[in-house]
């Protein structure tokens, strides 16, 4: 089994033209989030094909399927993860290989420390080990999943009950608060 759990984010949420590190930071983000996933898959897939079985889990993000202002390039790379995973699954499922894309919401980690709103209920941001157990229990059920029940709700319910303009506005507010939180932490 190959798990492509790669992720690089900006130092803090920021408008695209103002990202610290400029275009080089964006290039690095693309290299880590997309190029390394492709390279590892190309490295491991031949052995899976020769054995006639295998599994690849590619970690995307809810940012790749939901409004994600102030992390534009990151969100775009995570959208790529889904397209790569679903089309690769179509190519290799008949050869016994399952390829799945997981789009988690907030999971407690070093990378997400500034992004998780303080008022967010704990069940919406599980510890990494709890998320992994949930994700593995769902492996092979669908090609694309959020991996965790509460993240399923965050993915499915908002488009059903809120207009897109409201979801975009809320996402901007959440990411603006995350930006503020990160900048305040950097000042200390």
Each language-model region and where it sits:
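Flexible, glycine/small-residue catalytic loop immediately N-terminal to the helix bearing the conserved Tyr-Lys
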Residues: 13, 48, 66-70, 92
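Active-site helix of classical SDR
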Residues: 41, 77
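Conserved mid-core segment of classical short-chain dehydrogenase/reductases
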Residues: 9-27, 70
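SDR active-site lid
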Residues: 89-170
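Conserved hydrophobic beta-strands of the Rossmann-like cofactor-binding core
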Residues: 2-3
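A short helix-coil junction within the Rossmann-fold of NAD(P)-dependent oxidoreductases
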Residues: 9-13, 43-52
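Residue(s) in the substrate-gating loop at a strand-loop-helix junction
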Residues: 61
């Amino acid at each position: 089994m190959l798990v492509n759990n790669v992720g690089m984010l900006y130092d803090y949420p920021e408008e695209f033209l103002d990202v610290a590190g400029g275009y080089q930071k964006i290039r690095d983000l693309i290299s880590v989030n997309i190029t390394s996933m492709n390279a590892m898959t190309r490295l491991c897939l031949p052995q899976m094909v020769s054995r006639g079985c295998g599994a690849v889990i590619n970690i995307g993000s809810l940012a790749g399927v939901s409004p994600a202002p102030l992390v534009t390039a990151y969100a775009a790379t995570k959208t790529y993860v889904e397209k790569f995973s679903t089309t690769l699954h179509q190519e290799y499922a008949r050869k016994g290989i399952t390829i799945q894309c997981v789009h988690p919401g907030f999971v407690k980690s070093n990378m997400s420390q500034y992004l998780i709103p303080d008022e967010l209920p704990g069940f919406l941001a599980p510890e990494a080990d709890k998320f992994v157990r949930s994700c593995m229990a769902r492996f092979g059920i669908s090609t694309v999943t959020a991996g965790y029940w509460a993240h399923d709700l965050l993915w499915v319910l908002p488009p059903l009950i809120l207009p897109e303009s409201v979801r975009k506005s809320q996402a901007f507010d959440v990411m603006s608060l995350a930006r503020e939180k990160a900048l305040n932490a950097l000042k200390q």
